[in-house]
Amino acid sequence: MIISENNRREICKYLFKEGVCFAKKDFNLPKHPLIDVPNLQVIKLMQSFKSKEYVRETFAWMHYYWFLTNEGIEFLRTYLNLPSDVVPATLKKSAKPGGRPFGGPPGDRQRGPPRSDGDRPRFGDRDGYRGGPRGGDEKGGAPADFQPSFQGGGGRPGFGRGAGGYSAAAPSGSGFP
């Protein structure tokens, strides 16, 4: 596609300044939202840059996203005649706010929510977590005379690897009755 030199330069300036570019996948959009050129020209120029590995492309939710690579930075520096100390915004270090560092002196601030002395136990209402009475009483469970029995052979055939399936007898010599 033939793209005018002015439009090509505008797209390249924006891409180098930000380090990233996006475009909605709408080939009939008359103008890109951030650059004063047709959206189709942005998409086609970025496709060309992608084939030359100047940008890396991601597509999500009907939008293209292009990220400038190191080769692309070098190419755009020469194309736009920029000095080597000028870098895209994605490579600039962000200024950290001058706040307190993590940690600090231990008695400097109160940790956790404010507490009043002795109004609740240390672990809250978790005392009864395991349930049941806390004495040496008889524990709940099966009675002492409980004899569990499992149906084998009689009744219904086993399930899965249970009793051989389809009420078949155990193979002879297997050691099973």
UniProtKB/Swiss-Prot annotation:
Key words of the record: Cytoplasm, Ribonucleoprotein, Ribosomal protein
Region (Disordered): 90-177
GO molecular function: mRNA binding; structural constituent of ribosome
Cell compartment(s), UniProt: Cytoplasm
Record's compositionally biased regions (Low complexity): 141-150, 166-177
InterPro entries: Plectin_eS10_N, Ribosomal_eS10, WH-like_DNA-bd_sf
Biased composition annotated in UniProt, kind: Basic and acidic residues: 108-140
Biased composition (Gly residues): 151-165
Any single GO CC term annotated in Swiss-Prot or TrEMBL for this entry: cytosolic small ribosomal subunit
Any Pfam family hit: S10_plectin
Main location: cytoplasm
Superkingdom assignment: Eukaryota
Keyword DNA-binding listed: no
UniProt KW Ribosomal protein keyword: yes
Family: Belongs to the eukaryotic ribosomal protein eS10 family.
Name the record gives this protein: Small ribosomal subunit protein eS10z
